[in-house]
Amino acid sequence: MSPETAEAKQNSTSKHVNVPGKPEGWVPAGDLQEVISLEEMQKLPKETIFMTGSEAARESIRRANVDMAIAYPITPQSETMQQAGYLFDEGYIKDYYRAEEEIGTMSAISGASRAGVRSLTATSGPGLMRGMEALASWPGARVPIVMLNMCRVINTPLAIQPDNAEISFLLNTGMLVLHAENQQDFFDWPLIAFMVSEEVCLLYTSPSPRD
């Protein structure tokens, strides 16, 4: 979407909004989402820019038309979901909230996905371990949730250095794991993850082992 198109769309919808605490011209949640095919996206002009991994994730999420984003802050994931919060406020995510803790996060995002909305969450290291109980059912149910995991050592005592221990856990859950090595991957993988997970999702229609 061009800046001119975005501005025009904002001007056409903001007059209907009256939300206390929001500045004049605030765009409703999700109002700037636009459906575009993969072929059309590939034809758009491209440029090379320098950005952090969290900023790359933000640009990927902006293009993903996310319906629900739920997370609980944990270093170093907090900045990424903060960026998602900005996208919600700008109108690129329909609904966003911070859960009470990690098990609550994974339970809530599972419910959202099972209800049929495009769902995004993120966590890191110890947070993933705390939420593991709730996400264990995702692969068997084939829920198309996209979870961004920022690799961090599983700490005792406290440590925040990078590590791949939680990836080892995820590889044995049955979940599809896309491992990003740079900012370009962190832009590409979330978009690919949504397309792949929704393509292979067979919610409630999987044949039983006897079929």
Question: Which role fits each region the language model picked out?
Answer:
Residues 2-169, 174:
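Thiamine diphosphate
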Residues 161-203:
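Conserved thiamine diphosphate
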Residues 86-90, 199, 211:
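Secondary-structure boundary motif
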Residues 204-211:
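Conserved small/polar residues in nucleotide/adenosyl-binding loops
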